[in-house]
C-alpha cells in the first residue's frame, strides 16, 4: 500500500509540474480557410482539412500523439515512451524540464514568400541547460502536410560543451553503428505493421552527371517488417513509409544532396519507436543569446493512391510551401554561355548582345540573360564589381531590348556581390533574372546571410526580379528542398562541344529531366536547351534530332534557350517559332500544372514523356510524348496518371488537330508518332 501511495504522490507532483509549466498559456483557437489550430488542455492540435497532427505537453516538450489522414480517416501515430519531438544529446532529452512560456498563433505568408498559412510558435525555456526552443508549425489550408521547425536560443548559463549535434558513428563488436544526433522531428509511426520504406534524394553537381550511368535521382526501397534495429539513411532528403497504397512522407527542408550533406543535415533513423529526423543545421557553438536561430524544417505529409498519389501529395505540399509566381517566373530565358567552348565570356561583348536581342525576339524568347563577363572586373569565382562594363552602361542595350520586348537577366558570383550594385542594375533595367553562381555555404551564418540578401533584393523590386540558384560543382549550397521561394534551381550546364563530358546528348538530357520530374516540381527547375545542329558528332547524336524535339524537352520546366539565336539556321527558326508560339498560348496552364514522368525511362529507344495535370481545371492537362530515335514502334502504350477508364479529347497544340483516345481501366492509352525522334504536345480533357 505504501508503494501505491508513493506512486500516486509522485504522479500528483508530476501533474502539478506539468500544469505549472503550462499555466501561462491560455486556451486558444484560430481558423483560416478550413485550416485550424487549437491549444487547450495541454494539447496542441493543427488541421489543414486534409491532415491533422496533435501533440501533448509532457513537461519536457511537445510530443506527437496523433497523425491523421482526414480523408481516409486513418490514424498513423502510435503510443511511444518519448516525451519530446526534439532532442540535443548532451543537453536536451526526455528527462529535461521545460517551461512552456507562450504559444502564439498568427496568420502568415512569410512576407509574401510562401502561401498563406497559420503559424504556431511555442516557446519552451530550459533554464537548467540555458536554452530556449521555439517549436514552429506551419498549417496550410487544404494541404496534405504540415511543416515543423525548431528554433534555438541561448539563455544565461548556456555552455556548448558536451552537446552532440551530429549523428555519431561508433564501433561495436566489429560493426559500425550510428547514434542519432540532434533531432528536429519525430513521427511515432508503427513499423511493426506491414510496410516498406522508400528513400529518395537528388544529387548535387548536376553538370557532372550527364551520362547514362549517373542518374540525378537516387531511390531505394527497403522491405521487411517489423523493423527491429534502427534503419539509418544519411543520404536521402525524403522517406516514405508505405502501408500498401497509403502512407506518410517525411521530407527534410534542408540543403542536403545525396553526394553533399551540407551543414549538419542529419539523416533518417527508422525503428521500433517510429521515424526520427536528425540534423538541426545548427552547431552548439552557433547557438547565441541575442536571437532564435532556425534549424532545418521537416514536412510530414499523408497520401493515398500508391506512388502516383504519393508524388501528387508531395508536389501539392511543395507548391504550398514554395508557390510559383507566373508574372515573375514564367518565361523563356536564353543564356549567352550556351555556345561556350569551353569559356563563354566573349559572348557578353556588346556587339554580340545587340545582335542577339532581335534574333531572340524573332523566335519568341523573352529574356536574354548575360552570363559571366558583363561585370566590370574578374571572372568566375573571382568576379566582382557587378556593374555593366559597356560603354554607355545599360542605356543602349536597354533601349534595344525595350524596342523588341526583351527583358534581361544577369549572372552573378553571389558571394562577391554588393547589394547596392544589384539594386542599381534592377532599377536601371526594370527587371532582372539572376543566375546566382559560385556559392559556398559552410555554416548557419552563411545561410542566414545569403537568405537575408535574397529577401532584401526581392523586396526591393517585388515581382521584378528573381534568382535561379546554381548547384553546379560539389560545394555545399542549397540542395533541392530549400530556398526555392526566390525563383528556381539551375540544372545542368550542357555544351555544344567543349568540354567533351558536357556535350549535349538528347536522350541523356531527356532522361535526367524525366528523373527530376518524379519528386521535384518542374516549374522550379530551369533546364538548358542546346542547339542540336551545332553539337559535335563524335560524342553525340544530337544532329539527328530536330530543334523542336530538343526544345520540347524543356516545356514542362523553366526552359532556358542555352544557345545563341543568331546562330540558328532558317530551318531552326521555322521549327522553333511555331512551337514556342503554341507553348505560350497554353503556358499559363502548363506552368502551374503538376508534372509527372510517364512512359518508359528514356533510353534512346523508348516511348516516354511527361503528363502535366492542370491545377486550374479538373480533368484537364497536357501530354508531352517522345518516340526516341531508336524506337521501332510507331504506336506506343503509355501509362497515364489519374485517368483510368476515361476517354480523352486531345488537341495537338502545333497542328490544331483533334482526336480522342480511350484510357484502359488500368490507366494505359495508345498513341501514334509515325517517325522516330519526334514528339507530340497535346492538350487533353477527360470525359
What feature does the model see in each segment?
Residues 44, 49, 290, 454-660, ...:
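Active-site-proximal substrate-binding groove within the catalytic cores of carbohydrate-active enzymes
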Residues 148, 284-306, 677-685:
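Short Pro-Gly-centered flexible turn/kink motifs
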Residues 9-20:
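Bacterial N-terminal signal peptides
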Residues 418-484:
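Hydrophobic, well-ordered secondary-structure scaffolds
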Residues 34, 301-328:
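N-terminal carbohydrate-binding accessory modules
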Residues 24-46, 51, 63-267, 651-660:
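Polysaccharide-binding surfaces and accessory modules of carbohydrate-active proteins
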Residues 329-445:
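Aromatic-lined carbohydrate-binding/catalytic grooves of carbohydrate-active enzymes
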Residues 1-6:
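N-terminal secretory signal peptides that target proteins for export/translocation
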Amino acid at each position: 500500500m505504501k508503494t501505491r501511495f508513493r506512486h500516486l504522490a509522485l504522479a500528483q507532483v508530476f501533474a502539478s509540474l506539468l500544469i505549472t509549466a503550462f499555466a501561462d498559456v491560455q486556451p486558444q483557437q484560430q481558423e483560416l480557410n478550413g485550416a485550424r489550430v487549437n491549444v487547450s488542455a495541454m494539447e496542441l492540435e493543427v488541421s489543414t482539412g486534409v491532415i491533422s497532427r496533435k501533440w501533448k505537453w509532457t513537461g519536457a516538450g511537445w510530443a506527437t500523439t496523433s497523425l491523421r489522414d482526414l480523408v481516409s480517416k486513418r490514424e498513423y501515430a502510435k503510443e511511444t515512451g518519448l516525451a519530446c519531438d526534439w532532442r540535443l544529446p548532451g543537453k536536451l532529452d526526455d528527462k529535461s524540464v521545460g517551461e512552456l512560456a507562450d504559444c502564439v498563433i498568427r496568420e502568415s505568408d512569410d512576407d509574401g514568400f510562401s502561401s498563406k498559412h497559420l503559424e504556431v510558435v511555442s516557446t519552451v525555456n530550459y533554464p537548467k541547460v540555458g536554452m530556449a526552443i521555439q517549436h514552429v508549425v506551419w498549417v496550410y489550408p487544404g494541404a496534405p502536410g504540415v511543416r515543423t521547425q525548431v528554433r534555438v536560443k541561448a539563455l544565461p548559463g548556456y555552455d556548448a560543451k558536451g552537446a552532440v549535434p551530429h549523428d555519431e558513428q561508433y564501433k561495436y563488436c566489429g560493426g559500425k553503428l550510428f547514434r542519432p544526433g540532434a533531432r528536429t522531428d519525430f513521427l511515432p509511426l508503427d513499423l511493426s505493421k506491414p510496410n516498406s520504406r522508400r528513400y529518395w534524394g537528388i544529387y548535387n553537381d548536376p553538370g557532372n552527371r550527364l551520362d547514362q550511368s549517373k542518374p540525378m535521382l537516387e531511390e531505394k526501397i527497403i522491405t521487411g517488417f517489423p523493423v527491429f534495429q534502427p534503419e539509418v539513411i544519411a543520404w536521402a532528403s525524403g522517406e516514405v513509409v508505405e502501408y500498401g497504397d497509403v502512407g506518410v512522407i517525411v521530407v527534410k527542408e534542408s540543403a542536403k544532396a545525396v553526394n553533399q550533406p551540407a551543414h549538419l543535415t542529419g539523416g533518417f533513423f527508422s525503428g521500433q519507436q517510429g521515424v526520427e529526423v536528425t540534423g538541426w543545421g545548427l552547431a552548439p557553438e552557433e547557438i547565441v543569446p541575442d536571437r532564435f536561430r532556425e534549424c532545418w524544417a521537416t514536412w510530414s505529409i499523408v497520401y493515398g493512391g500508391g506512388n502516383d498519389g504519393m508524388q501528387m501529395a508531395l508536389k501539392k505540399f511543395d507548391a504550398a510551401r514554395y508557390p510559383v509566381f507566373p508574372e515573375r517566373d514564367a518565361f523563356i530565358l536564353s543564356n549567352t554561355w550556351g555556345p561556350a567552348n569551353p569559356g563563354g565570356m566573349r559572348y557578353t561583348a556588346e556587339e554580340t548582345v545587340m545582335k542577339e536581342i532581335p534574333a531572340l525576339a524573332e523566335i519568341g524568347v523573352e529574356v536574354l540573360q548575360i552570363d559571366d563577363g558583363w561585370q566590370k572586373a574578374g571572372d568566375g569565382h573571382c568576379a566582382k564589381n557587378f556593374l555593366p562594363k559597356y560603354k554607355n552602361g545599360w542605356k543602349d542595350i536597354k533601349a534595344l531590348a525595350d524596342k523588341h520586348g526583351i527583358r534581361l537577366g544577369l549572372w552573378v558570383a553571389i558571394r562577391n556581390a554588393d547589394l547596392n550594385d544589384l539594386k542599381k542594375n534592377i532599377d536601371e533595367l526594370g527587371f532582372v533574372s539572376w543566375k546566382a553562381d559560385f556559392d559556398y555555404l559552410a555554416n548557419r551564418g552563411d545561410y542566414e546571410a545569403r537568405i537575408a540578401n535574397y529577401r532584401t533584393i526581392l523586396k526591393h523590386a517585388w515581382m521584378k526580379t528573381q534568382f535561379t540558384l546554381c548547384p553546379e560543382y560539389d560545394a555545399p549550397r542549397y540542395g533541392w528542398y530549400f530556398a526555392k521561394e526566390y525563383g528556381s534551381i539551375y540544372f545542368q550546364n550542357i555544351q555544344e562541344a567543349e568540354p567533351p563530358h558536357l556535350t549535349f546528348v538528347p536522350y541523356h538530357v531527356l532522361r535526367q529531366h524525366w528523373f527530376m520530374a518524379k519528386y521535384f516540381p518542374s516549374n522550379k527547375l530551369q533546364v538548358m536547351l542546346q542547339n542540336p545542329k551545332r553539337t559535335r558528332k563524335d560524342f553525340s547524336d544530337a544532329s539527328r534530332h530536330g530543334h523542336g524535339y530538343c526544345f520540347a524537352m524543356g516545356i514542362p520546366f523553366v526552359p532556358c534557350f542555352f544557345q545563341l539565336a543568331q546562330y540558328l539556321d532558317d530551318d531552326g527558326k521555322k521549327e522553333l517559332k511555331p512551337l514556342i508560339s503554341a507553348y505560350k498560348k497554353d503556358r499559363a496552364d502548363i506552368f502551374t500544372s503538376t508534372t509527372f514522368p510517364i512512359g518508359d525511362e528514356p533510353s534512346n529507344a523508348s516511348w516516354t514523356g511527361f503528363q502535366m495535370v492542370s491545377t486550374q481545371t479538373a480533368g484537364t492537362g497536357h501530354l508531352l510524348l517522345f518516340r526516341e530515335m531508336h524506337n521501332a514502334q510507331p504506336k506506343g502504350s503509355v501509362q497515364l496518371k489519374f485517368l483510368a477508364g476515361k476517354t480523352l479529347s486531345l488537341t495537338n497544340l502545333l497542328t490544331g488537330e483533334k482526336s480522342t483516345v480511350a484510357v484502359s481501366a488500368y490507366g494505359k492509352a495508345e498513341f501514334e508518332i509515325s517517325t522516330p525522334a519526334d514528339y507530340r504536345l497535346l492538350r487533353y480533357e477527360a470525359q
